């Protein structure tokens, strides 16, 4: 008995050591925001917090150098993105108090006891409004800014249309519009590029999973599409050619998520995220569903983005009615301008969004 206990303890100790040396083990404590001398900024916030939102425990990271700054609610795409800030700093926390919320079923908010099919679009929209209300109350601000990325834009724009009085402005990064048409355009692009490259293996994989307006996206297509896009530099980031090295490893070595939370990041990614709503996403034309908004609207889009179509987002921008609107093309970005071109993103937010202007926007 003692020998078995000693053996188990030794295995646990070795396992713990390997986790530490690999960088996977972490305390999960948010890093403080400090000055040049390493002293914590007195008015700053850097914390992980959990709330009961519409009956479900949900988590978020709050970061800001001064709690009196404007509040920015950041709504992620297919999976939470806060961990990326350790490798790809955004600087958002220097201008805003940023709420990196892990929405229902994702990351900190993942709950294996809640079946994905029970999570509805209506719940996502209601949760966005509940988080906005929490932030408004906690930081004593009448309104917050809402920034959404990729799949998050599908929910966020509908929340803005429903309750514009809660928000100063909406920033859509890689805005979804007509996602089925976006997937069809991407499929045609990928087939053309891999045929030109003479990559018959990838070409066969793509041709085995054709995307059509009539039949949608077949089983297995999205995994092939992701690998094909990243090889061409038109996936998550223009300079990212592998999800493993560009996303998975940064998530597993993040110091601000515990090991268990890191595992929940990926469980949520594969079982919840946008996928339970994929059929609804493909069937929805947001340009028809939300033809106008009552607050300033800003679209940030990478020209190399083939996850959410750049041309379709621009067409929507041209047609949508808003009191102020601006479209910003990022020439060095694919799907994630805030991580790929953070300085320009921050300048747009600081100079245009906060002032309700479009001086830095694209010109005809």
Predicted regions: what is each one?
Residues 123-143:
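Conserved acidic catalytic loop of the alpha/beta-hydrolase fold
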Residues 68-78:
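Short beta-strand element of the alpha/beta-hydrolase
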Residues 333-342, 346:
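Catalytic histidine-centered segment of alpha/beta-hydrolase-like enzymes
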Residues 156, 162-214:
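A catalytic-pocket lid/entrance helix-loop region that shapes and gates access to the active site
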Residues 197-288, 295:
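Alpha/beta-hydrolase
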Residues 82, 105-119:
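Glycine-rich "HGGG/HGxG" loop immediately N-terminal to the catalytic nucleophile
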Residues 293, 299-301, 305:
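Short beta-strand/loop motif that positions the catalytic acidic residue
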């Amino acid at each position: 008995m003692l020998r078995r206990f000693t053996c188990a303890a030794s295995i646990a100790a070795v396992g713990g050591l390997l986790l530490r040396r690999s960088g996977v083990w972490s305390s999960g404590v948010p890093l403080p925001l400090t000055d040049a001398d390493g002293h914590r900024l007195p008015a700053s916030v850097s914390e992980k917090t959990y709330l009961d939102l519409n009956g479900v425990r949900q988590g978020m990271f709050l970061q800001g150098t001064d709690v009196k700054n404007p509040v920015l609610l950041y709504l992620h795409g297919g999976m939470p993105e806060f961990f990326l800030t350790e490798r790809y700093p955004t600087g958002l926390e220097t201008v805003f108090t940023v709420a990196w919320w892990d929405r229902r079923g994702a990351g900190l908010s993942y709950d294996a006891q809640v079946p994905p099919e029970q999570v509805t679009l209506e719940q996502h929209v209601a949760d966005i409004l509940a988080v906005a209300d929490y932030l408004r109350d906690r930081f004593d601000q009448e309104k917050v800014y809402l920034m959404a990325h990729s799949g998050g834009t599908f929910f966020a724009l509908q929340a803005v249309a429903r309750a514009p009085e809660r928000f100063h402005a909406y920033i859509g990064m890689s805005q979804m519009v007509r996602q089925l048409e976006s997937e069809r355009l991407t499929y045609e692009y990928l087939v053309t590029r891999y045929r030109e490259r003479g990559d018959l293996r990838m070409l066969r994989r793509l041709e085995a999973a054709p995307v059509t307006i009539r039949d949608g996206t077949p089983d297995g297509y999205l995994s092939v599409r992701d690998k094909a896009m990243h090889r061409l530099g038109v996936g998550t980031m223009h300079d990212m050619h592998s999800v493993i090295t560009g996303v998975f490893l940064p998530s597993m070595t993040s110091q601000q998520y515990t090991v268990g939370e890191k595992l929940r990041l990926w469980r949520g990614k594969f079982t919840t995220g946008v996928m339970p709503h994929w059929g609804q996403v493909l069937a929805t034309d947001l340009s028809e569903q939300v033809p106008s908004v009552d607050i300033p609207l800003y679209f940030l889009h990478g020209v190399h983005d083939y996850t959410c179509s750049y041309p379709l987002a621009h067409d929507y921008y041209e047609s949508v009615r808003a009191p102020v609107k601006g479209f910003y093309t990022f020439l060095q970005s694919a799907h994630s301008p805030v991580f790929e071109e953070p300085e320009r993103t921050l300048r747009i937010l600081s100079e245009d969004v906060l002032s309700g202007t479009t001086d830095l926007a694209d010109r005809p």
